[in-house]
Amino acid sequence: MNNFETKAVKTVGAKLIHYAYKNPQKNVPKLLKFAKRLAGNMFTEATFTAPIDIVNNKENTWHDYFYSMLDDIDRDYLESLLLTFAFDCGYIGTKTLRKNREIYKCNIPWVILMDPTSACNLKCKGCWAAEYGHKSNLALDDMRRLIKEAKELGTHFFMFTGGEPLVKKKEILTLCKENPDCIFLAFTNGTLVDDAFCEEILKCKNLSLALSIEGSEETNDARRGEGVYQKTLKAMEILKKHKCLFGISVCYTSQNYDAVTSDEFYDKMIANGVKSVSYTHLTLPTKA
């Protein structure tokens, strides 16, 4: 697909996604019909039929979640995220990845994780970043080169970890703006989230966050430091106000697993605007 064809297909896709907002039950099937015609046999039949059931069937587990996304997330921002995820990451990315996997006879990842910096403004118990030092950094040009080479192979999805990646929020925003055909997700402690940053997220339209939190205030601050829990909730408040998409990343331990899997915890996170949750185990630092 040449540049003209790519632009034309994305333009049609953008209009269909925008159109689907007006009447999801009627227009989502039309959007998926277009997507299926474009993708051919690249994906399974369920890829295109399952979303229709989600939209129309109130008994479907994902039904309320789908409509909450439409209500809670900024429309232009969400439309752009959906288009980039479906077309650039899903269609173009998958097609290129599969081709290059055959050429190079090796796996090529659909998503790449990178640490812009090992620097962090917290010192959480057991965190490798707190033990290994704060002086390791990826230069902006190095990250640019990594993304450029990854896109050539078919990877259009990038995750930022650390350290605390928002220590380098300026560089992250630059990368997002320079690569509108990519999706970016930053794992962050949330303490550096502010109104200005959220406004930039909405301008980029391809960045979302996963905030670290670990259950109750007691279990969270026992490992992350006094006052961090309230700062994380404040970050959620700001992100929700700006209608940005965000989730949480939970590190589970023997000390907090009850707290981070309780209905009370889930209900509170949902009320605070959280749209996804991922669980990670504790990675202890080791000597080289």
Which residues does each PLM region occupy?
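Intrinsically disordered, low-structural-confidence terminal and linker regions
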Residues: 1-24
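Conserved alpha-helical substructure of the radical SAM core
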Residues: 30-196
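Residue-level recognition of the GNAT/N-acetyltransferase active site
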Residues: 117, 253, 285
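Flexible cofactor-recognition loop at the NAD(P)H-binding site
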Residues: 126, 215, 287
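Radical SAM/AdoMet-radical enzyme domain recognition
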Residues: 140-160, 166-279
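Conserved small/polar residues in nucleotide/adenosyl-binding loops
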Residues: 280-288
